[in-house]
A protein has these predicted regions:
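DUTPase catalytic domain/fold
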Residues: 1-147
């Protein structure tokens, strides 16, 4: 496993820095920097109070926390949320309450998402007249079976 250094800035000095729940986890826990309530099917942009400087060649992906998704119906609208290497603004999370009947209450400091940082290559596209043939072909959207 390789290590990289990422500079992080607290935009609010009371914010807890992201950390891994377990040493081998892929995602760093992001916390809400505000109290809020999401009504059923409501979307909300939630502040984290943090900004990061990702190295060139890396991107951040903001993902839902599985426990919140299954237990409360809390998810992220644009999952994964993409953080480009040169973005320096505040990290915010677009949450949605998918529970049809219950409000979801979020307190400042609650873990609301996870940040996965991955190396991403620069891709050189080459336009061609035909693509190589494969067994799968253009099969997608359930072509390999539903379950």
């Amino acid at each position: 496993m390789s290590n990289i250094t990422v500079n992080i800035k607290r935009l609010d000095p009371t914010v807890e820095l992201p950390k891994y729940a377990h040493p081998t986890d892929a995602g760093l826990d992001l916390r809400a920097n505000e109290d809020c309530t999401l009504k059923p099917f409501e979307r909300r942009l939630v502040s984290t109070g943090l900004a990061v400087a990702l190295p060139d060649g890396y991107a951040g992906f903001v993902q839902p926390r599985s426990g919140l998704a299954i237990k409360q119906g809390l998810s992220i609208v644009n999952t994964p949320g993409l953080i480009d290497a040169h973005y320096r603004g505040e990290l915010k999370v677009i949450l949605i309450n998918l529970d049809p009947t219950n409000d979801i209450h979020i307190n400042k400091g609650d873990r609301i998402a996870q940040l996965v940082i991955q190396e991403v290559p620069t891709v050189n596209l080459i336009e061609v007249d035909e693509l190589d043939k494969t067994d799968r072909g253009n099969g997608g959207f359930g072509s390999s079976g539903v379950l």
